[in-house]
Amino acid sequence: MPRIIGFIFAVFLGWSAPVWAQGSLNLYCSATIEWCQPIARGFERETGIRVTLAQKSTGEMLAQLRAEARNPRGDVWWGGTGDPHVAAGEEGLTQAYESPRIAELHEWAQAQWRQTEGRTVGVYASVLGFGFNTELLTRKNLPAPACWTDLLRPEYRGEIQMANPNSSGTAYIVIATLVQMMGEDPAFEFLRRLHGSINAYPRSGTAPITAVARGETALSISFVHNAAEERAAGFPVGHAVPCEGTGYEIGSMSIIKGARNMAAAQRFYHWALSAEAQLTASQEAKKLQTMANRRVPLTDGAPNMATARIIDYDNARFGASAERRRLLARWDREVGALPR
């Protein structure tokens, strides 16, 4: 059940919407709750529009949009990996919108907007890689991984977590990245071999790096900004970008087709693309992604996408609903069904 943050709960969060608040917005959010809340608060402060917030992982939110297609309850979907947003647009669950602020964005954010004919836009980006607990590695005399192939080393057996790709956009990007780098059959052979080293497939994409920070597992396949955030919070966490190259996420935003509060949805969309909104919310949430607006500087300690070896990720192909369903079904048959 999603956590809901609405106007009536404002007193518990230490803030309140202006007494002149007009209108409302139902915000679906697939970032972490620690980031969703500042986004909701910031928009209420700026506009006086009352926000009701529902938070779920990207895959779970896509499933909810499909279930609500005939009677949409949300207005805007913010955050989470871009592939499910692309799939939602392809399925007619979201609708096109053009903000004058599109021109202020990095090319990768604009490219996603163009590719989907305006149905989704990038709001942040991050690189896929590994997180690891430095204290656990030392205690167990394990090396830090540097490459994808390192994950198959026998000493890592039972030491790695990766999210479940059926619910996690992060884990789906792992599959899509490996398919693009290795070819589909070799990628699935890699995933089958990796399965023996996986100790859990949690539903959330951030759960593996949280487990690393808590010392519950030695390694995770995660976005490197999440590892950097855990380190900044004082946990013994390091990260690495795979030496062979890697994929990346474009955290996205979409207006839900048939939104009941369309004017508020469009106003939120325009506001959320501003440098001020992105800087304030990311700082409050202590997030280290690269933000879409070019005027937002890279935060100290944030991984720099410009220095990573990033593949030419095919968002059109791997965001397509049919391709997504096919790859997930293959993962279920050939990997998820295997004993551990």
Residues of each region from the PLM?
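A ligand-binding cleft/hinge motif common to bilobed small-molecule-binding domains
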Residues: 83-87, 213, 218-236
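Short beta-strand->loop
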Residues: 95-104, 120, 149, 235-247, ...
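A bilobed periplasmic-binding-protein/Venus flytrap-type ligand-binding module shared by bacterial periplasmic
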Residues: 131-136, 176, 249-262, 280-283
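Mature extracytoplasmic/periplasmic domains
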Residues: 256-315
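Conserved C-terminal helix/tail region of periplasmic/extracytoplasmic solute-binding proteins
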Residues: 313-340
